[in-house]
Amino acid sequence: MVADLTKGILKWKSRIEFDAVGSSSYYEELKGLPPLASHKKLTQAAIFNSTKYELLQVKKDILSIYEVVSRDIDEERNQMQQIELQLKKSLKKVEHSYKNVLKQRASTNCINGNDRLLANAEKKIGSLNEELACVNDIVSDIVNNLTALNANLPKKAQLLKDDSINVAHYPLLFDFLHKSCPKSIIATSEASIHENASPSPLLEHDELPAESINSFYGENELQSDSLAPLQTHDDNISSCKKILPPKFNTTSGPSIETNFENISADGLTYTKCSLKNSISLT
């Protein structure tokens, strides 16, 4: 039986045909592959030595990235600190304002606080009204005194006229007088009518030399300085009218200086007599 089995196997082997590897294409491709490296080159040290420059570059890149990131973090930290300081200052201001508002609300929240504020406002308004009334009284007194003094002067010597040079010198005063008491301002037409209606007595007499005038004024001044007894007001006016200053036909521009060209005879005599009366009263 064993002999029969061996015979059968041999017959089967004789029938099978094997293909050789050397004649296949795969074997040719296997031959084309490079040979394996040595085991010394496959160690860890050999592998890291071959990539040493790449490792150094990666290390440098990591360090530079770390520096940039750390710098950005420091800047952000500084900015956060500054913002925190500003927020603290703002918080202090807000707390201070809040405390002030609380105080104001506590002082004005109740009825007594509002009444106190109203009373203070009424006191201030009352004091302002009193001061305004005092100012109005003072101004009215000044205007009354000014108009009274102007009315006592002769018509030619009066200062409150529309055509007077004082209008240019004191525009605010004349504007105020026009608004407050327009009757105190003498119009130009009214003044001319009054002058034509009452001519000056100086035109009825002849002219006198200047020496007599100077001697007359010099004697009067000496008498006033020595405080001699004077006559009454009517006698003084009559005695002054007896000696009259000459007429001057020359004209000149407007002037504020007192001279014989811009002072009328009536105003001059009236002023002299008024001075004498004031000296006699004192």
Curated annotation (Swiss-Prot):
Q: Where in the cell is it found?
A: Cytoplasmic vesicle; Cytoplasm; Vacuole
Q: Please state which protein family the record places this protein in.
A: Belongs to the VAB2 family.
Could you confirm whether the keyword Coiled coil appears in this record? yes
What's the protein here called?
Biogenesis of lysosome-related organelles complex 1 subunit VAB2
Biological role:
Component of the biogenesis of lysosome-related organelles complex-1 (BLOC-1) involved in endosomal cargo sorting.
**Main location class:** cytoplasm
Q: Which GO terms describe its biological process?
A: endosome organization; regulation of protein localization
Q: Which UniProt keywords apply?
A: Coiled coil, Cytoplasm, Cytoplasmic vesicle, Transport, Vacuole
Task: List each coiled-coil range.
Answer: 64-140
Subunit and partners? Component of the biogenesis of lysosome-related organelles complex-1 (BLOC-1) composed of at least BLI1, BLS1, CNL1, KXD1, SNN1 and VAB2. Interacts with VAC8.
Q: Does the keyword Cytoplasm apply?
A: yes
Which cellular components does GO assign to this protein? BLOC-1 complex; cytoplasm; endosome; vacuole
